[in-house]
Amino acid sequence: MRTLFIGDLHLSADRLDITQAFNRFLDTELDDADALYILGDLFEVWVGDDLAAPFALELAHKLKQVSQTLPIFFIHGNRDFMLGKRFAEAAGMQLLPEVTCIELYGVKTVILHGDSLCTLDKAYQRFRKLRSFACARWLYSCLPKKRRQAIANKIRSNSQSSNQQKSYVIMDVEPSAVNALFVKTHTTRMIHGHTHRPAIHIVDNACQRIVVGDWYEQGSVLSVSANGVDLKSLPFETT
């Protein structure tokens, strides 16, 4: 048996090829799996459950079917932090706190999206702190749908422009933040996404940090079992 982790699919109506690849993954890669964890940024943007795009509603139906036989867990990312209980229930996903500790085949493991570890990106961390306030999210949800969509598009555009100007170091995790989380959670394994830099890192010769990759050019999935870990890519099918 094994547990699967994915993240950073950034699904959108503009890239339905990624949605198709994800559907194939759900159809073919879940044999003998104990659970599926989605570590955030399942969608490129999410402005509210009441504005879910048709492709997202179709995906929710697919996930709901999968969840009848396989538990699906979801941690919010920086792109889909407004995804709520309404859509999660429709998709059969169980929402988890942004930092969650689980026992994985005898190894205590902390899982998260990963944006909280990029502490050198001060501008983003200020925005992240603002969006963490329930009152801010509530005020946003009260805005007219067109206004919410416009704000989301603006944030997305600014983020893409800003990221092009930021250094590699600033956009990666900060080692001190990683070490602090290991100490705080008393774990020896960490699994996250966000940076789009899939790798398995050994920290201080004692802990393991695994980064799942994005799905822009190919899929990425981490399989964890009692025998160890396997981080692999999933090439998209070409027609």
From Swiss-Prot:
Asked if the record carries the keyword Translocase, the reply is no
Tell me which InterPro entries the record gives: Calcineurin-like_PHP_ApaH (IPR004843), LpxH-like (IPR043461), Metallo-depent_PP-like (IPR029052), UDP-diacylglucosamine_Hdrlase (IPR010138)
| Pathway assignment | Glycolipid biosynthesis; lipid IV(A) biosynthesis; lipid IV(A) from (3R)-3-hydroxytetradecanoyl-[acyl-carrier-protein] and UDP-N-acetyl-alpha-D-glucosamine: step 4/6
Superkingdom of origin: Bacteria
Major site of localization recorded for this protein: membrane
User: Does the record's keyword annotation contain Cytoplasm?
Assistant: no
Under Gene Ontology molecular function, one entry of this record is: manganese ion binding
Q: Which cofactor does it need?
A: Mn(2+)
Membrane topology is:
Peripheral membrane protein
According to its UniProt record, which reaction does this protein catalyse? Answer: UDP-2-N,3-O-bis[(3R)-3-hydroxytetradecanoyl]-alpha-D-glucosamine + H2O = 2-N,3-O-bis[(3R)-3-hydroxytetradecanoyl]-alpha-D-glucosaminyl 1-phosphate + UMP + 2 H(+)
Fetch the Pfam families from UniProt: Metallophos
- Which family does the record assign? Belongs to the LpxH family.
Question: What NCBIfam families does the record point to?
Answer: lipid_A_lpxH (TIGR01854), PRK05340.1 (NF003743)
Q: What does this protein do?
A: Hydrolyzes the pyrophosphate bond of UDP-2,3-diacylglucosamine to yield 2,3-diacylglucosamine 1-phosphate (lipid X) and UMP by catalyzing the attack of water at the alpha-P atom. Involved in the biosynthesis of lipid A, a phosphorylated glycolipid that anchors the lipopolysaccharide to the outer membrane of the cell.
| Protein name as annotated | UDP-2,3-diacylglucosamine hydrolase
Q: Which gene does this sequence derive from?
A: lpxH
